[in-house]
Swiss-Prot record:
Cofactor note: Binds 1 [2Fe-2S] cluster per subunit.
Organism: Chlorobaculum thiosulfatiphilum
Family: Belongs to the Rieske iron-sulfur protein family.
GO cellular component: plasma membrane
Major enzyme class: translocase
The protein's name in its UniProt record: Cytochrome b6-f complex iron-sulfur subunit
Cofactor requirements of the protein: [2Fe-2S] cluster
Molecular function, one GO term: plastoquinol--plastocyanin reductase activity
Length: 181
C-alpha cells in the first residue's frame, strides 16, 4: 500500500534528526569543502567514462572484426608431405612440352624431352614467379625479370640467387610420379 501525505512536514523532519530539513532541499551540510575544488571530480569522472566507452568500443570492434578477418584469411591447408606422389598422366606432357603439377606444397614443372622427364621447381628463386619452359631455346624462362635456367635448373643468366630445386620424375604405366631428389 502506497503512503500518502506530506513527507517534508516539520514534524517528520524534526523526527529525522538534526540537519535533515536542509539536506532534503538539496544542500549538503556537515561536510567540509573540498581542498582542490571540484576540478578533480569532473576529470576523474570523465577519464573513467572515457575508459569505459573506449573499452566497450574495443570489445565491439574486436567482436565485429574477428569473424571478418577469419573469413578473409583462409585456413592453413594441412598437406601431408610425401616422398613420392603420382601427379598426373603421361599423356598430359607430350614430347617437347611441359606442365606444372602440385607436389606436396611445391609447384613442380615437368618437361618431356624425347620421352625422358625432367622435373624442377616451377617457382623462380628471384621473386617467386612461375617459370615457363621454352622448348626452342631449351631453357626455363621467368617472365617477371628475365631469369633463365638450364633444363636441369642451373642458372644461365638473370637476377636469381639460386638454381631451381630438382626433383625426380618417371613414368609408370600411364602415370607421372614425382619424388624428392
Amino acid at each position: 500500500m502506497a503512503q500518502t501525505g506530506n513527507f517534508k512536514s516539520p514534524a517528520r523532519m524534526s523526527s529525522l534528526g538534526q540537519g535533515a530539513a536542509p539536506a532534503s532541499s538539496g544542500a549538503v551540510t556537515g561536510g567540509k569543502p573540498r581542498e582542490g575544488g571540484l576540478k578533480g571530480v569532473d576529470f576523474e569522472r570523465r577519464g573513467f567514462l572515457h575508459k569505459i566507452v573506449g573499452g566497450v568500443g574495443a570489445v565491439v570492434a574486436v567482436s565485429t572484426l574477428y569473424p571478418v578477418v577469419k573469413y578473409i584469411i583462409p585456413p592453413a591447408r594441412k598437406i601431408k608431405n610425401v616422398d613420392e606422389l603420382t601427379v598426373g598422366k603421361a599423356s598430359e606432357v607430350p614430347d617437347g612440352k611441359s606442365k606444372i603439377f602440385q607436389f606436396n606444397e611445391d609447384k613442380v614443372i615437368v618437361v618431356n624431352k624425347g620421352g625422358a622427364l625432367t622435373a624442377v621447381s616451377a617457382v623462380c628463386t628471384h621473386l617467386g614467379c612461375l617459370v615457363n619452359w621454352v622448348d626452342a631455346d631449351n631453357q626455363y624462362f621467368c617472365p617477371c625479370h628475365g631469369a633463365k635456367y638450364k633444363l636441369t635448373g642451373e642458372i644461365i643468366s638473370g637476377p636469381q640467387p639460386l638454381p631451381l630445386k630438382q626433383y625426380k620424375a618417371r613414368i609408370e604405366g600411364d602415370s607421372i610420379i614425382i619424388s624428392k631428389a
